């Protein structure tokens, strides 16, 4: 029997390493979380004689589903216990906690006796909760990968036409839940080409696009997002678009980016070229006070700093934008060249300030639009603008759902997706279960 350990950043990558080196017959005999990722222990020619006879696929899938549900339930119970433990520490601070006394049936003839004090409950080490949560997370991720592989294999055998549509959606880069929703909408269509056309039409309708262009609606508009997404360039395109259409007298620019070298100089140059006033807001300075002299302007465009999620200044910036008296419409600027994890992290970091929508940049450089479209659809983020080049303002466009979908199809992967990629797509379905209702 050949036994080997594999290290990777996440469970899916670890499973791929196992498959590549030991093949599909390898058995996973251990897994644990480590610093920087996961560790899998896999074996080849693992003796299974002590185990129960092989279960048919349908039954195996059902058991895996039950186990997946149990893990989710255990995770919820763990969270509940930790919350209860925290609440008890707050409610009984300064008091000694005792274990509950056993229930004693009343007996009239028995003489009353003073109950002996119960021993104090031992404090729970928070590290125990962390270890349990980490182990549960690893088990859940492993199950998701296995369930995804099993579900994909069964679909290929039972519904080859639908499996082909899944492959085409995976080439676009759409997430598993979005693909499933699209296929549910076209389940009754048997002709493959018609089904594909309807899938794309439904996808176009899923993309939320504002009825009124943001700069036409007016008000305070802020560009938010991580560094490198194209916030300042997008702001320059919006400002030039407005000036060319309405003139410079009702436009003002504001910079909250005092962290990046040369950021304020860029905006100062833009203001000079467009003949538009530029206001600079330093950290800790009141944004409301800075905006007060600009209240008569029809449009105020704000450029913000692209800060890391761990930077304390980011929280201050988001709280400022979400503060009373600001009424800013915050648009998350997302580079379509970014990886899925980067896009997801950006959304979760910046949603705290309240997002009015998103602006998709660098469409001319991207190799896939699936990840960013999946994010916008799943989080109901309206797509306000698109940019696809360096020209100001010529490379700024209003989105159209069918044009975005057409572009996504045009830049899709040329090669057929691997079996591992399809299994990962199905694993995403278990990681993001269908919502009730």
UniProtKB/Swiss-Prot annotation:
Cellular component terms (Gene Ontology): plasma membrane
Bilayer topology annotation: Peripheral membrane protein
Keyword vocabulary terms for this entry: Bacterial flagellum biogenesis, Bacterial flagellum protein export, Cell membrane, GTP-binding, Membrane, Nucleotide-binding, Protein transport, Transport
GO molecular function: ATP hydrolysis activity; GTP binding; GTPase activity; signal recognition particle binding
Entry's localization field: Cell membrane
Primary location group: membrane
Keyword Protein transport attributed: yes
Similarity comment: Belongs to the GTP-binding SRP family.
NCBIfam families from the UniProt entry: FlhF
Protein name (database record): Flagellar biosynthesis protein FlhF
Annotated source species: Pseudomonas putida (Arthrobacter siderocapsulatus)
Species classification: Bacteria, Pseudomonadati, Pseudomonadota, Gammaproteobacteria, Pseudomonadales
């Amino acid at each position: 029997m050949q036994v080997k350990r594999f290290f990777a950043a996440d469970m899916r990558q670890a499973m791929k390493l196992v498959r590549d080196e030991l093949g599909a017959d390898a058995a996973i005999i251990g897994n644990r979380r480590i610093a920087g990722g996961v560790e899998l222990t896999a074996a080849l020619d693992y003796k299974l004689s002590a185990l129960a006879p092989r279960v048919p696929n349908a039954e195996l899938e059902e058991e895996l589903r039950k186990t997946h549900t149990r893990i989710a339930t255990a995770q919820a119970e763990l969270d509940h216990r930790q919350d209860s433990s925290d609440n008890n520490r707050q409610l009984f601070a300064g008091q000694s906690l005792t274990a509950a006394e056993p229930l004693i049936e009343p007996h009239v003839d028995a003489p009353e006796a003073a109950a002996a004090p119960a021993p104090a409950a031992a404090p729970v080490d928070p590290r125990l909760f962390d270890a349990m949560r980490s182990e549960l997370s690893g088990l859940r991720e492993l199950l998701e990968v296995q369930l995804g592989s099993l579900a994909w294999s069964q679909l290929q055998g039972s519904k080859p036409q639908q499996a082909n549509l899944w492959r085409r959606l995976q080439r676009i880069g759409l997430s598993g839940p979005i693909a499933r929703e699209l296929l549910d909408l076209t389940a009754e269509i048997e002709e493959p080409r018609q089904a594909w056309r309807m899938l794309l039409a439904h996808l176009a309708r899923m993309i939320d696009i504002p009825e009124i262009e943001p700069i036409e609606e007016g008000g305070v508009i802020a560009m938010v997002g991580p560094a490198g997404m194209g916030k300042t360039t997008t702001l320059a395109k919006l400002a030039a678009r407005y000036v060319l259409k309405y003139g410079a007298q009702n436009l003002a620019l504001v910079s909250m980016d005092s962290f990046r070298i040369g950021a304020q100089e860029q905006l100062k140059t833009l203001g000079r070229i467009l003949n538009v006033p530029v206001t600079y807001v330093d950290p800790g300075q009141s944004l409301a006070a800075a905006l007060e002299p600009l209240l008569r302007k029809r449009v105020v465009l704000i450029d913000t700093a692209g800060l890391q999620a761990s930077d304390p200044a980011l929280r201050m910036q988001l709280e400022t934008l979400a503060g009373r008296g600001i009424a800013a419409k915050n648009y998350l600027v997302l580079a379509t060249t970014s990886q899925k994890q980067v896009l997801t992290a950006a959304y979760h970091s910046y949603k705290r300030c309240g997002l009015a929508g998103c602006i998709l940049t660098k469409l001319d450089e991207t190799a896939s639009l699936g990840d960013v479209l999946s994010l916008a659809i799943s989080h109901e983020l309206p797509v306000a603008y698109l940019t696809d080049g360096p020209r100001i303002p010529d490379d700024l466009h209003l989105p159209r759902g069918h044009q975005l979908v057409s572009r996504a199809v045009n830049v899709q992967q040329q090669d057929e997706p691997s079996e591992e990629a399809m299994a990962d797509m199905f694993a995403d379905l278990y990681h993001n279960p269908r919502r009730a209702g």
